[in-house]
Swiss-Prot record:
One of its GO terms (cellular component) is GET complex. It is found in: Endoplasmic reticulum membrane; Golgi apparatus membrane. The gene is GET2. The chain crosses the membrane at residues 159-179, 206-225, 269-289. Belongs to the GET2 family. Component of the Golgi to ER traffic (GET) complex, which is composed of GET1, GET2 and GET3. Within the complex, GET1 and GET2 form a heterotetramer which is stabilized by phosphatidylinositol binding and which binds to the GET3 homodimer. Keywords: Endoplasmic reticulum, ER-Golgi transport, Golgi apparatus, Membrane, Transmembrane, Transmembrane helix, Transport. The keyword Aminoacyl-tRNA synthetase does not apply. Its main location: endoplasmic reticulum. HAMAP family: Get2. It is a multi-pass membrane protein. This is Golgi to ER traffic protein 2. Residues 1-80 are annotated as: Disordered. Residues 180-205, 290-292 are lumenal.
Length: 292
């Protein structure tokens, strides 16, 4: 019989030890080992292999398949019934401003601190829809403001018509007077040498009176239109509304809005001069045709 190797001996020794432990002698062996030491006083030691195991979970404690809630296939929380939310909100009046602020809140979050582009956009939208952003205006106040705006528009058109009639009457009388005083010679000549001659005194006084009337009429026009009611209404034209809506999308456009409004006011004065000048050209054309 061949000799066992060291590895086989250790294996047999381990199997014998496990067999003894399985027979319930683990506690005796442990006490025997501990009794040989001088530091251990107690011999009532029980091995963990001889301790009976207590069942931590019984069959009754296990949840049945019927009572166990199914595990969701995703990690999202369960969504509550939307009908309960609708029942809670059905008696509440909808706040359009709050809803728009919530919608615009996400876009305003990444515009940087201190940026109120969402609030400006909301205010411009409210103004474009002719609503009060504070939400405190009643139907009677809105109707009154609408009627007042219409009255100011009518009054502004009435003043423009008055200036138009006064200008035409004054310029017509000025032209007729100098035409008769010049011996019916106040007309345009088709010949270059005639136009190159010295200006007649009647022609000079005619144009002096024309320019004087223009300066007086345009100054009076600006003075009347500078009233607050007309000044505020002049900002409600189509160009100003387009710029107001564009500034809500592109805030840089808002800085040019006062300049455009001022340019429109100056254009009204320039249009008065151009219109009166075209009227004089028409009169000179008639006299030239009749003179020939």
């Amino acid at each position: 019989m061949s000799e066992l190797s060291a590895e086989e001996k250790r294996k047999l020794l381990r199997e014998r030890r496990q067999a003894k432990m399985a027979q319930g002698k683990a506690t005796d062996r442990l006490n025997n080992i501990l009794s040989q030491g001088s530091s251990v006083k107690s011999s009532n030691v029980t091995s963990v292999l001889d301790k009976p195991e207590k069942a931590t979970t019984t069959v009754m404690d296990l949840p049945s398949r019927e009572t166990q809630s199914p595990t969701p296939l995703h990690d999202d929380p369960e969504v509550p019934d939307i009908t309960s939310l609708l029942k809670e909100k059905e008696n509440e009046a909808p706040d359009m401003e709050a809803m728009l602020q919530q919608i615009l809140g996400g876009s305003g979050a990444h515009t940087g601190p201190g940026n109120d582009g969402g609030a400006n956009f909301l205010q411009e939208m409210m103004k474009a829809m002719a609503e009060d952003p504070s939400g405190g205006s009643t139907a009677e106040e809105s109707s009154y403001q609408s009627q007042l705006s219409q009255y100011h528009a009518y009054e502004q058109k009435q003043w423009k018509a008055r200036f138009l009639v006064v200008r035409w009457i004054i310029h017509t009388l000025n032209f007729v007077y100098h035409y008769i005083a010049s011996g019916y010679k106040l007309s345009a000549s088709p010949y270059a040498f005639v136009r190159a001659q010295a200006v007649d005194s009647h022609v000079r006084t005619f144009f002096t009176a024309f320019l004087t009337v223009e300066v007086a009429v345009i100054s009076a026009y600006f003075l009347v239109m500078s009233q607050p009611k007309f000044k505020d209404f002049s900002r409600e034209n189509l160009v100003s509304r387009i710029l107001s809506m564009a500034s809500a999308v592109v805030p840089a456009v808002g800085r040019y809005q006062p300049l455009v409004t001022r340019a429109l006011v100056y254009w009204n004065g320039a249009s008065i001069f151009v219109g009166d000048l075209m009227l004089m050209v028409f009169y000179f054309g008639i006299t030239s045709v009749l003179g020939n």
